[in-house]
Amino acid sequence: MSVSSERSALDRPVSLFEHAQRLHRLTPDDPLPDGGHPFPDSGGGRPEVPDEERKPALTAALRDIVASPSLPAWDLHDLCARLPINPGYAAWIREVAPEPSSQLVEVARWLVGNGTAWRAVTVGLSLLAGHAEQRDVPLLKVIGRLRFADHLALEALTQIPGAEQDVIWLAERSRHRSRLRAVKPLIGNRDPVIRGWVRSTPRELLSSDLARTISEAHGLAELLSGQPVDDALWDQAGNLLLAMTSTRNYRSEIGRASCRERV
């Protein structure tokens, strides 16, 4: 596939990456208003494909994309833009290309950085996850500011070694529940700053089992038995213990937590 950045038409709208950059300059530290809408290119309505035909249609179209090495970049983009998908279809997209070639990864990278239609960017992000590199971090942080891309961008970032602080940066500037996409992969990280951030997950986001997992992975009882214990750690411990009493996931975990008696 040709991934030349040369545009095939002068009247194309700005890319969603450029759009996200502009909005980020206006709102650098908070989620973007309206998730970044309106986009420069609305992309039209959702393609009309019956539910029972959607997966076969998507699979066939993606196989055509993967098998078309001579397809010009913008033709590829426009084909992706017409796919009957939403960001929740990432797993389906990856089923078609579970081990993408380096050429296909470059195509994915190009779609994320140059796409003007959110469906095309979604295809790029779906294929890039698990194959992104350090050089992709700035790209993912910017495109992830748009609400439709936040979960997929966080998923890709969490799989890049050394990008943990970038994961936190994006999670703190995304919709509230997106933080869970960052917290779960970071639970086992050994960096004290990152561990403190994980323990500070707002209680309304914590299920009882997730709170228990964090508490036990971080050795909460041992942390509290050490000296000195600062106010932040007491707050984190109280937050996790209260979350473990929740029955939001149909059972409380406080009685099963190994740290309950020592805490």
What are these regions (language model features)?
Residues 122-125, 141, 154, 168, ...:
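Hydrophobic core positions within HEAT/HEAT-like alpha-solenoid repeats
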Residues 1-135, 146, 218, 224-262:
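Extended repeat-based scaffolds of very large eukaryotic assembly and lipid-transport proteins
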Residues 85-89, 114-123, 133, 144-152, ...:
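Generic helix N-cap/helix-start motif at coil->alpha-helix transitions
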Residues 107-110, 137-141, 166-170, 197-198:
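Buried hydrophobic core positions in alpha-solenoid tandem helical repeats
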Residues 169-253:
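Long alpha-helical HEAT/HEAT-like repeat alpha-solenoid scaffolds in very large eukaryotic proteins
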